[in-house]
């Protein structure tokens, strides 16, 4: 009966000592020893699709921008800086590019981290995703300075190239002051049609991930093709329309002729004394008929006289 309590006491002591020893174990150096957390089985996060983390925790002062862990390079090369965010922030902030070094700025327009590395990080969108580090160590690749302004001007914000290309330099005074290089480089761009909708001063460095307003793309639904043949309607023959008979123009009513004024009868002159009275037209016709009869009779009498005269001879 005494063996069971004794075994229980020994097991408790052994468990306590083993737990204390585990506290001194260094962080895991490979994924097989790593502590599994939600999202660890997913692939490397794409720009703008990072795990749901509190980005305000990445505000690291330059004097604290130092690596403390021994596996920082492998952690970064394997893309686990965001997957194991809490460990990376506390032990590998510099290698994971979460901050900029104290007294690490340079006035020269060049990539302090190397052109090859900076170009690769720029393609991934890290100029905006990791602004503190990239602004200090990749300013040339991130287009914060360059030959367009003869290396005389340097932008103060990693969002300047996108702001300038969108036309905000001529519509926002704060952006114009923050972006002397980009606003000169893209001075020919048309002004933005709407004001910049976000705060120019970010609340924390990693708020920079949202640069330009999003554009909603309307998706048009395409109806599924029908399996039934479409009904075809025969077009009517191209028959010319009958020509309508022309409508005769209305005949204007004739204007009434003016009624002539009555002519007054000519005055009759009184016959002169001793002159025969004027005959009427009927009397003149009768007289002419009598005269013609007399002439015919005279001619006939002449012929008879000639016949008598010849017979007497």
Curated annotation (Swiss-Prot):
Ranges of compositional bias, category Pro residues: 245-265
Domain ShKT: from-to ranges: 65-99, 109-145, 151-186
Regions of compositional bias (Acidic residues) in chain numbering: 32-44, 280-297
Disulfide bonds: 65-99, 72-92, 81-96, 109-145, 127-142, 160-179, 169-183
Localization annotation: Nematocyst; Secreted
Any GO molecular function: toxin activity
Annotated region described as Disordered, given as residue ranges: 24-56, 222-313
Tissues/organs with expression: Nematocytes. In late planulae, is only expressed in a handful of nematocytes in the lower pharynx. Is absent from the tentacles and outer body wall.
Cellular component GO terms, alphabetical: extracellular region; nematocyst
Signal peptide feature range: 1-19
InterPro entries per UniProt: ShKT_dom
Keyword Signal attributed: yes
Bias-annotated ranges (Low complexity): 222-244
Keywords recorded for this protein, A-Z: Disulfide bond, Nematocyst, Repeat, Secreted, Signal, Toxin
Keyword Transmembrane among record annotations: no
Assigned protein family: Belongs to the NEP3 family.
Functional summary from the UniProt entry: Probable toxin probably only used for predation.
Name of the featured protein: Nematocyst expressed protein 8
């Amino acid at each position: 009966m005494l063996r069971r309590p004794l075994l229980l006491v020994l097991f408790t002591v052994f468990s306590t000592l083993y737990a204390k020893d585990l506290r001194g174990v260094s962080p895991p150096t490979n994924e097989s020893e790593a502590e599994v957390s939600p999202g660890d089985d997913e692939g490397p996060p794409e720009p703008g699709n990072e795990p749901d983390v509190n980005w305000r925790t990445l505000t690291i002062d330059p004097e604290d921008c130092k690596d403390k862990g021994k596996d920082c390079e492998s952690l970064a090369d394997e893309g686990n800086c965001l997957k194991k965010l809490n460990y990376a922030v506390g032990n590998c902030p510099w290698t994971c590019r979460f901050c900029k070094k104290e007294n690490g700025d340079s006035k020269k327009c060049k990539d302090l981290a190397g052109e090859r590395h900076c170009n690769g990080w720029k393609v991934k969108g890290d100029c905006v995703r990791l602004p503190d580090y990239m602004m200090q160590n990749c300013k040339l690749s991130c287009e914060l300075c360059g030959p367009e302004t003869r290396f005389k001007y340097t932008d103060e914000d990693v969002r300047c190239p996108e702001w300038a290309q969108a036309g905000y330099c001529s519509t926002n005074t704060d952006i114009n002051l923050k972006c002397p290089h980009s606003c000169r480089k893209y001075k020919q761009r048309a002004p933005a049609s709407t004001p910049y909708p976000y705060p120019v001063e970010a609340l924390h460095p990693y708020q920079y991930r949202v640069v330009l307003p999003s554009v909603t793309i309307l998706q048009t639904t395409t109806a599924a093709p029908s399996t039934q043949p479409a009904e075809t309607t025969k077009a009517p023959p191209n028959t010319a329309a009958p020509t309508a008979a022309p409508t005769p123009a209305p005949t204007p009513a004739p204007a009434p002729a003016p009624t002539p004024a009555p002519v007054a009868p000519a005055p009759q002159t009184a016959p002169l004394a001793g002159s025969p009275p004027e005959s009427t037209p009927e009397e003149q016709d009768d007289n002419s008929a009598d005269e013609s009869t007399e002439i015919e009779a005279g001619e006939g009498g002449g012929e008879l006289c000639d016949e008598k005269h010849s017979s007497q001879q």
